[in-house]
């Protein structure tokens, strides 16, 4: 192995996708929530989980525990496949990346996906996508026994996340 190879690349420094969470907040149960769940299952290919109101909001007629949305968590190859379809429909901006290497973006219409067509009986739904990036070795901060902090030089930052998405998914990030 040459000297330049050892300084440019190390397998423990390579970012990877831990998970992708796709969320649709409808604000109420009933037919709208069922439509959102159907759309999410069709786009992601996985079963949805309902999200519930954490606190009562009388102004909106919500009680604690009322179903108000649906979400799907994708990992491994399904997360990569979903991002390959979702990122062309999104306009990424530098401020959508946080300091720990995560990115969140919205897709305004579910019809932006190639597999989805407009159905007047359902309408148009938008969704929020959150991508969580990690590096190998992050488990030491999450394990039950012997937890340690991740060293600052090993933590992901927004520049690492931007370069990962640009190089692996060929997206353009606006300044």
Curated annotation (Swiss-Prot):
The species this protein was found in: Halobacterium salinarum (strain ATCC 700922 / JCM 11081 / NRC-1) (Halobacterium halobium)
Function text: This is one of the proteins that bind and probably mediate the attachment of the 5S RNA into the large ribosomal subunit, where it forms part of the central protuberance. In the 70S ribosome it contacts protein S13 of the 30S subunit (bridge B1b), connecting the 2 subunits; this bridge is implicated in subunit movement. May contact the P site tRNA; the 5S rRNA and some of its associated proteins might help stabilize positioning of ribosome-bound tRNAs.
Protein name in UniProt: Large ribosomal subunit protein uL5
InterPro entries: Ribosomal_uL5, Ribosomal_uL5_arc, Ribosomal_uL5_C, Ribosomal_uL5_dom_sf, Ribosomal_uL5_N
Keyword RNA-binding: yes
GO biological process terms, semicolon-separated: translation
Keyword Isomerase: no
Subunit and interaction comment: Part of the 50S ribosomal subunit; contacts the 5S rRNA and probably tRNA. Forms a bridge to the 30S subunit in the 70S ribosome.
PANTHER family from the UniProt entry: 60S RIBOSOMAL PROTEIN L11-RELATED
Gene name in the database record: rpl5
Key words, A-Z: Ribonucleoprotein, Ribosomal protein, RNA-binding, rRNA-binding, tRNA-binding
Any one GO molecular-function label of the UniProt entry: rRNA binding
Gene Ontology CC annotation, any one: cytosolic large ribosomal subunit
Family according to the record: Belongs to the universal ribosomal protein uL5 family.
Gene3D superfamilies assigned to the protein according to its UniProt record, in alphabetical order: 3.30.1440.10
């Amino acid at each position: 192995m040459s000297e330049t190879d050892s300084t440019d690349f190390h397998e423990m420094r390579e970012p990877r996708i831990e998970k992708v969470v796709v969320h649709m907040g409808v604000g109420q149960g009933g037919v709208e929530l069922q439509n959102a769940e159907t759309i999410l299952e069709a786009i992601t290919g996985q079963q949805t989980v309902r999200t519930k109101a954490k606190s009562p909001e009388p102004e909106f007629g919500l009680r604690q525990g009322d179903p108000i949305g649906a979400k799907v968590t994708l990992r491994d190859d399904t997360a990569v496949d979903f991002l390959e379809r979702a990122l062309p429909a999104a306009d990424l901006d530098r401020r959508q990346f946080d300091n720990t290497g995560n990115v969140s973006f919205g897709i305004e219409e579910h019809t932006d996906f190639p597999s989805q067509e407009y159905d007047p009986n359902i309408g148009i739904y938008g969704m929020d996508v959150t991508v969580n990036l990690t590096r190998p070795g992050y488990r030491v901060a999450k394990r039950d026994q012997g937890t340690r902090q991740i060293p600052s030089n090993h933590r992901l930052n927004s520049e690492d996340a931007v370069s990962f998405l640009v190089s692996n998914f060929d997206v353009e990030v606006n300044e």
